[in-house]
Design a protein with these regions (language model features):
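Structural and coupling elements of P-loop NTPases
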Residues: 1-686
């Protein structure tokens, strides 16, 4: 018997900036009956780009969840940003989606962000579809994009299910569905019948040849030169897609609506249901505990979900977007955050439509919905990736989300007294929504230091402070977000003693341990002393506060710690009158001396830089990169006579790279940069 989740498809739309993700989302909403008229990115009228900054800039900044029906199925899609500075939105979308649609521009081909996002999708084992859009544009090159896909997808082979038919000048005459033999596309001219027959024969030959290599069931048909019936073909395509052996490729134009209905049919036919995703190798590794044993005393599954993001909006109000992996959630249910040891009661359940929502009584396993708190209490401090459990469920923590560390910082100062007063709270609220925003109090009163993933990211932070929180700011020059780690393991104790009077001496002893961790581990802080201590709660909190401040940059280097485990092992005092300030001081002494003993190492962020330019300019670009301490990884040709260079380069060397590249290339080159690694900053003593 079919389960309700068999008729659910959750997928993210991923691509490079300006490839057409948001336009495709608009067209999907139109085709599924959710929109009478499609909005336009250039007019700022799209459903999924609802932030003021998105509509002004014409780009997606936050991921937007939209639920719509198609042929008896419930589709939930996430339109994700295409700019590298908003990687967190893409990362958490990939974590909770069951599949992905990669959108490629038929003119520009496989661009840098497309490649980066697909690598991350492949890391989650996501099956997917590809849609080559903008075939209505001059210079569209479907075959060239297909060849690039073959290099990008690695062992997963592109499987074209449709092909464009063009005249000798490259003008699009029609798009051929290889499964049905039907034509769609421009209505003003029909391609010659012999061209259609040749394209159909050749396209089906390649389709069958590709499938026969990974699906034995079609090998006999291929060897006999026979095209299988539609049912057998769909089954073979579906099985190969779910095993990540192929990625079906559709094509058309989102703006004109060509190929979108065919794409939606492919979504329900070939992409996995939530249950199939859970049964995949990735699902079994990630959710080993969600089996028959995870049932309530009533015999039904406990509700288990992952927090995707906190959304603050005028309508429908603040809510938490979640993905359910088990059970049912409904209004009035008490939920427990397994990561933060806090509970809260669900007030409303929302079906999401970007900035809009529809209230529903409940949601079940496989769905992506919004949960609001009751009117009596606000949403608690739940972070993206936290595991939420129905009250009474056994303790379970699902795999957490990982986000890149900030690479750039700005010192912000409120313009007037009210701005300076409200700035910290506004930054704290933004950081709750976006886990890649970090902030701390600045070097002077009224100042804060905000850190993010790039210049655009921090520009948007300032714009949102002004438009959403009415906080106007002045900003200093961008600064690279360095980090500190340690070279070796160190364990020591320090004692702080002070005589307050001839008869009263206060004393505290703190023992700590520093240990280097592998790359991308972040800072891990542990307080095992609390398991056996008899110290008052206030003293324990003072010790934890001192340690947290030290990790966040309150140390001799001035930079936050990373790739380091700090363990506060023992804390003791012989004087019952010892207060919090004494423990605070003793902890800081132990931490500072331990950092020095372990060998502090300042790390600089290194970026993976990709530059695309006309071929004749790539030499000058490479010379400039060499002067910026770049390590060139590859240089290759692009369709249309362009060249691409990929290099690793320290962030400090490319803070103002956009201006320099514009000068070198006369404005004809483009670049993207994504965090790649942390490396030891030059000039430090060994």
């Amino acid at each position: 018997m079919d389960e309700p989740s068999d008729f659910i498809r959750n997928f993210g739309i991923i691509a490079h900036i300006d490839a057409g993700k948001t336009t495709l989302t608009e067209r999907i909403l139109h085709e599924t009956g959710q929109l009478r008229v499609c909005g336009a990115v250039e007019d700022g009228t799209t459903v999924s780009d609802y932030l003021l900054q998105e509509r002004e800039r014409g780009i997606s900044i936050v991921s937007a969840a939209v639920t719509c029906p198609w042929r008896g199925y419930q589709l939930t899609l996430l339109d994700t940003p295409g700019h590298i500075d908003f990687t967190a939105e893409v990362e958490r979308s990939l974590r909770v989606m069951d599949s992905a649609i990669a959108v490629f521009c038929a003119v520009r081909g496989v661009q840098a962000q497309s490649e980066m996002v697909w690598r991350r999708a492949a890391g989650y084992g996501l099956p997917g579809l590809a849609f080559v859009s903008k075939l209505d544009r001059e210079g569209a090159d479907f075959e060239g994009v297909l060849a690039q896909m073959g290099r990008l997808f690695g062992k997963t082979r592109p499987l074209p299910l449709a092909r464009p038919i063009t005249d000798p000048r490259g003008r699009l005459l029609g798009i051929l569905n290889l499964l049905t033999g039907e034509l769609y596309g421009p209505a003003d001219e029909t391609p010659p019948e012999e061209d259609v027959e040749l394209a159909l024969w050749d396209g089906r030959r390649i389709l069958l040849e590709t499938l026969a290599e990974c699906q034995d069931s079609l090998l006999e048909d291929y060897l006999a030169g026979r095209f299988p019936d539609r049912g057998a073909l769909d089954m073979a395509i579906r099985q190969a897609t779910l095993k990540n052996q192929v990625i079906p490729v559709l094509c058309g134009s989102s703006k004109e609506g060509w190929g979108v209905r065919t794409l939606l049919d492919a979504v329900v036919s070939y992409l996995p249901s939530p249950a199939e995703r859970m049964a995949s190798p990735w699902g079994r590794r990630t959710f080993p505990a969600l089996g028959e044993s995870f049932l309530s005393p009533k015999g039904r599954p406990y509700a288990v979900m992952t927090a995707v993001k906190l959304v603050r909006s005028p309508w429908p109000g603040d809510y938490l977007a979640v993905r359910l992996y088990s059970g049912t959630v409904e209004a009035g249910m008490l939920l427990r955050d397994a990561n933060r040891e806090l509970s809260w009661r669900v007030g409303r359940v929302w079906r999401l439509r970007a900035s809009d929502a529809e209230e529903i009584p409940s949601a079940s396993s496989g769905e992506v919905v919004g949960l609001a708190a009751t009117p009596e209490e606000p949403l608690p401090a739940i972070r993206a990736g936290d595991t939420l459990l129905e009250d009474g469920a056994p303790v379970l923590r699902l795999a957490k989300m990982k986000f890149p560390e900030p690479v750039l910082s700005l010192v912000l100062e409120g313009v007037d007294a009210d701005d300076r007063k409200n700035l910290p709270k506004a930054l704290e609220t933004l950081a709750e929504e976006d886990p890649t925003i970090r902030w701390k109090n600045g070097p002077r009163d009224g100042q804060c230091t905000a850190s993010g993933l790039g210049e655009l990211h921090l520009q948007v932070v300032r714009e949102r402070l002004k438009s959403e929180y009415r906080v106007k700011t002045r900003a200093g020059a961008p600064m690279v977000a360095y980090r500190t780690t340690v070279a070796s393991k160190c364990r020591l104790e320090r004692e702080f003693r002070r005589q307050l009077s001839p008869a009263l001496t206060v004393q505290a002893r703190v023992e700590v341990e520093f240990e280097p961790l592998p790359p991308n581990s972040g800072a891990v802080v542990e307080f095992p002393f609390r398991e056996s201590t008899t110290l008052p709660l206030e003293c324990c909190e003072a010790i934890q506060q001192a340690t947290t401040e030290f990790v966040d940059g309150g140390n001799p280097t001035g930079y936050p710690l990373t790739n380091t485990r700090i363990t506060v092992l023992e804390v003791s005092s012989v004087s019952p009158d010892t207060s919090e300030p004494v423990f605070l001081t003793a902890t800081r002494l132990a931490l500072v001396d331990s950092l020095e003993e372990a060998g502090e190492v300042v790390m600089e962020p290194v970026m993976r830089l990709e530059v695309s330019s006309p071929a004749e300019q790539i030499g000058a670009i490479l010379n400039d990169l060499s002067a910026r301490r770049a390590r060139v990884l590859q240089v290759d040709a692009l369709p249309g006579g362009g060249s691409r260079a990929v290099a690793l380069v320290p962030m400090v060397e490319i803070v103002s790279y956009a201006t320099a590249l514009r000068s070198i290339s006369a404005g004809r080159a483009l670049f993207t940069a994504e965090p790649a690694a942390l490396e030891k900053r030059p000039g430090q003593d060994k």
